[in-house]
Curated annotation (Swiss-Prot):
Disulfide bonds: none annotated. One of its GO terms (biological process) is DNA replication. The record marks 96-97 as: Cleavage. Residues 27-47 bind DNA. It comes from Xylella fastidiosa (strain Temecula1 / ATCC 700964). Belongs to the peptidase S24 family. Represses a number of genes involved in the response to DNA damage (SOS response), including recA and lexA. In the presence of single-stranded DNA, RecA interacts with LexA causing an autocatalytic cleavage which disrupts the DNA-binding part of LexA, leading to derepression of the SOS regulon and eventually DNA repair. This is LexA repressor. It catalyses: Hydrolysis of Ala-|-Gly bond in repressor LexA. It is an enzyme of class 3 (hydrolase). InterPro entries: LexA, LexA-like, LexA/Signal_pep-like_sf, LexA_DNA-bd_dom, LexA_repressor, Peptidase_S24_LexA, Peptidase_S24_S26A/B/C, WH-like_DNA-bd_sf. It comes from the Bacteria. Keywords: Autocatalytic cleavage, DNA damage, DNA repair, DNA replication, DNA-binding, Hydrolase, Repressor, SOS response, Transcription, Transcription regulation. Its EC number is 3.4.21.88.
Amino acid sequence: MSLSDIQQAILSLITNNINADGVSPSQTEIARAFGFKGVRAVQHHLDVLEQQGMIRRIPGQARGIRLKHLTEVDEVALALQSKDVLRLPVLGRVAAGQPIGADIGEDHVVLLDRVFFSPAPDYLLRVQGDSMRDEGIFDGDLIGVHRTQDAHSGQIVVARIDDEITVKLLKISKDRIRLLPRNPDFAPIEVRSDQDFAIEGLYCGLLRPNR
């Protein structure tokens, strides 16, 4: 089956967008470009393009259209050119439970869409424990951390107590600082005056790897 003129034009739009920006257009952007009333028509044409071996789609990923003729190396190179793609190192573990010893050493680097985070993170940490369960942060998740020492009461932070790292809800009152879990099975951590305490960064979103 040959491609229609519209399907060839959609393929050209996808190719040009990937070459220029490193990412494919969204289905909404394709619909707008061709005057479709919604994305259903776009999905039909994308189905045909995929059946013809021109593209492949990554389920559940925004802008997840890929050109079949690109190699994995080509895709990574294009992604690194995009302003919407973050290249983030995984810098060890962070406790969502009792603080654990710092485990800071670059494990690997992942490429992620900026849309998953606000503000943009500087690095990722892998969560160990479930003390932040009620905030939707689970054991094994990768959390984005925006590196800063400025934080306000009520924000979720990555904090250092002496040589240990933890992720908790920050509560600051007139005479004390507490790090609160979001799971009733865990007790708050009271920061003592004789401890070396610092905010390492703000929690700004997460990635849940396939279990």
